Regions:
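Catalytic pocket-lining loop regions of alpha/beta-barrel enzymes
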Residues: 114-115, 128-233
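Histidine-centered catalytic micro-motifs
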Residues: 2-12, 147-151, 183
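Active-site gating/metal-coordination segments in enzymes
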Residues: 51-52, 60-154, 158-159, 214
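Short beta-strand segments
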Residues: 4, 54-57, 93, 181-184, ...
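Mid-to-C-terminal alpha-helical segments outside catalytic/metal-binding sites
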Residues: 1-5, 12-52, 226-233, 241-273
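Short helix-capping segments at alpha-helix termini
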Residues: 78-87, 174-178, 200-203, 227, ...
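Conserved, mostly hydrophobic/aromatic
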Residues: 6, 45, 108, 116, ...
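A general structural detector for well-ordered alpha-helical segments in enzyme core domains, enriched
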Residues: 40-44, 68-75, 104-108, 131-135, ...
Length: 273
């Protein structure tokens, strides 16, 4: 089984606008595969032999909780089609500025959703801020998985202060029992060499969604090659990467004996698949 632990798609009504907006913000350094819709995402998965994908929405304001949760439930209940129910594992997003965030997290867990996506730059918070730790403690207590942007973001070229390896380390040293997946190879590329040690010591998982990043490529290859197999998850950041290319890249670097765990076994364990 192949599981993409980091993917995105958008409702049909806003997909074209969302894709165009991201391309504009990044001044053409990101380009999309396909049209950004759920159906197109499923088509690309089928063509590449990807069995399941974790869908990672981002709540950029507290009021988006309801619509994101409603979409996740619609996928799980089959309202958006049999393929989506079978192939998509919908995460939701929580916003640290939501005054009802703890109640909303309980609602998320009660709905059977497996995890929560965060992007500290888009959501304007730092993982190292003690004010957000109660939210993450609640997530840990509820048994939910965190999928979080890590390190540099092309849309925020001057920001390195909210979700780098050091901030992740501070969070996990203060919030015990949290299953934390740091995207983009943990965001370690471009930081000091000891950044890798920080994430290893705090027990973070990382995903492989770094192929669309042309900077620090040698360092990314080193990270992908050396990271412990049991804490590495195949992820793409689709639609910003072509599935066959992402699969080839990981397979060309990791030992074939690791492929089963990296491409699906570890994800199945975290998600209870």
């Amino acid at each position: 089984m192949t599981v993409d632990f980091h993917s995105h798609n958008f409702p049909k009504a806003i997909a074209a606008r969302a894709i165009a907006g991201m391309c504009k913000i990044t001044e053409g350094r990101l380009w999309a595969v396909g049209d950004g819709t759920l159906e197109n995402h499923l088509d690309h998965m089928e063509l590449a032999g990807v069995d399941k994908a974790v869908m990672c929405p981002i709540a950029t304001k507290p009021s988006q909780h309801a619509v994101i949760l409603r979409t996740a439930r619609a996928i799980m209940d089959g309202e958006l089609g049999e393929r989506a129910a079978r192939m998509i594992v919908p995460f939701v997003s929580a916003h640290p500025g939501d005054p009802d965030v703890l109640a909303h997290l309980r609602e998320i867990a009660a709905a059977g959703i497996k995890g929560v996506k965060f992007h500290p730059y888009y959501q304007n918070f730092s993982l190292a801020d003690p004010e957000v730790w109660p939210m993450f403690r609640a997530i840990a207590d509820l048994g939910l998985v965190v999928q979080c942007h890590a390190g540099f973001d092309v849309g925020y070229p001057d920001r390195f202060d909210a979700c780098g390896p050091n901030e992740i380390g501070v969070l996990l040293k203060n919030v015990h029992g949290l299953t934390f997946v740091a995207a983009h190879l943990g965001g370690c590329a471009g930081f000091a060499p000891h950044a890798t040690d920080v994430l290893l010591e705090c027990g973070a998982f990382i995903d492989t969604s770094a192929l669309h990043r042309d900077w620090h490529k040698d360092e990314e290859i080193r990270l992908l090659r050396c990271w412990p197999t049991e804490r590495l998850l195949f992820g793409t950041d689709f639609p910003w990467v072509h599935y066959p290319e992402a699969i080839r890249w990981v397979k060309s670097i990791r030992d074939p004996r690791d492929h089963e765990a990296v491409f699906g076994g570890n994800a199945a364990r975290l998600l209870g698949l």
